[in-house]
Regions:
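Alpha-helical cap/lid subdomain in secreted, periplasmic
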Residues: 39-46, 62-195
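Serine-esterase "nucleophile elbow" of acetyl-processing enzymes
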Residues: 1-53, 58, 63-70
Length: 195
């Protein structure tokens, strides 16, 4: 199954424009409706979802090279770690090293690439996920990346945000969410639209 998805992403990459925003995550991230969200929130940049089921931080660097590097994204939203709870518990240092390796590969490909490390959802206050998210935050800070905290349900109303973006658009600002906007806005839009 994964090989078919990888082949599909490679074919899509041949059609994709260089740069833009890439979501590189696992599990439910595959189903993020990027087209609808891009339209609803007037995100001007191209948004590509290159998420796969069961991505571990152990194989993320290789998969990034296979299915994302060809696009040469200007922004990467990393949402990796869901499959690594046991690995993290057994060896948190190795987890951190693998995540740093992934970030290093992204930066080597494009030094100006903006990277957001997105936390894992922890709506049930699982102490293991809380600790993993602390490590993700530390990794983001130490690697000079943004940290997108989506661990807890937040009071965020997508409709209100969409209406505000629409208003800004209507009064003459033609590019309300260009690539240089805060990454946290993109994280909220892409990962919290259904929270």
């Amino acid at each position: 199954m994964r090989e078919a998805e990888i082949r599909n992403y490679k074919k899509l990459n041949e059609l994709a424009d260089q740069s833009g925003i890439v979501i590189f995550g696992c599990g439910e991230d595959k189903n993020i409706p990027t087209c609808e969200l891009r339209q609803a929130f007037a995100v001007e940049s191209k948004v590509y979802n290159r998420s796969l089921d069961h991505i571990s931080v152990i194989d993320a660097a290789g998969l990034y090279g296979e299915i994302v590097a060809q696009i040469a994204p200007e922004t990467v939203l990393l949402h990796i770690g869901e499959e690594d709870k046991d690995f993290f518990t057994e060896n948190p240092t190795e987890f951190d090293n693998k995540y740093r390796e992934l970030i290093g590969i992204i930066k080597a490909q494009n030094r100006k690439c903006r990277i957001a490390v997105v936390s894992l959802k922890n709506y049930d206050n699982d102490p293991q996920l809380e600790e993993l998210n602390k490590h993700l935050k530390y990794i983001a800070e130490s690697e000079q990346c943004e940290y997108g905290d989506i661990a807890n349900k937040k009071v965020w109303n997508p409709k209100t945000t969409r209406d505000a973006v629409s208003f800004v658009y209507s009064i003459g600002f033609a590019h309300p969410l260009k690539i240089n906007r805060p990454l946290y806005d993109l994280v909220k839009i892409m990962f919290c639209y259904n929270a």
